[in-house]
Amino acid sequence: FLSAPRRAVVFQPVYIGYERLIEGKSYLDELSGQPKQKETIWALIKAAIEVLREHYGKVTVNFGEPIYLDDCLAKAAPNWREEIAGTENKFPWLAEMIGDLALQINVNINRAADVNPINLLAMALLSTPKHAMDENDLLAQLELSKRILNCEPYGPRITVTEMNAPSMITYGEEMGVVCRTKHPLGDVLSMQGETAVLQSYFRNNVLHLFSAAAWISLCFQN
């Protein structure tokens, strides 16, 4: 592109939101420090068969704000066209521009996140010592989290589930990520075992959306 910028180059950030990991076992293995296994055609076929047998919920695809390479180059070196004319030399500003571009792609992906019920359930339950909450407390936390997202959106491309808190809990139970323990004083909802570890993926995907509100809350607490 630098030597012959005939057509515009655009980087399109894309956020893909899941409700259940297809390669959950691989994710657990990587978290435990095991090396990533090489994928084979037979492994892919086996995985495809298993996917068809299970319910993995919905997948959401959001498109972030596109990034134009021309704009990045102009910001890094306003006279870049004149500088590169007739030379093959590397330029000191190029490496820094590539780093800035990579960062901006990640930022724009985060600004297009989708927040589904599994994300909110994971964020609420995994924040407790035993990954469990009284149902009424969980309902209140889910409603609060959703209200924060709707009142102070991280960006205009952020999408948030339309489910209310009771529907989120019911959906989490249907997806097999939330367990209910009956109790006369109020049911307890929890994430257990490997399920809780897997849900860290969904929690981590939306934590950045609450960072500003969390810092403000921390200031008041201290």
List each model region and its residues.
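Membrane-interfacial terminal anchoring regions of lipid-handling membrane enzymes
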Residues: 1-222
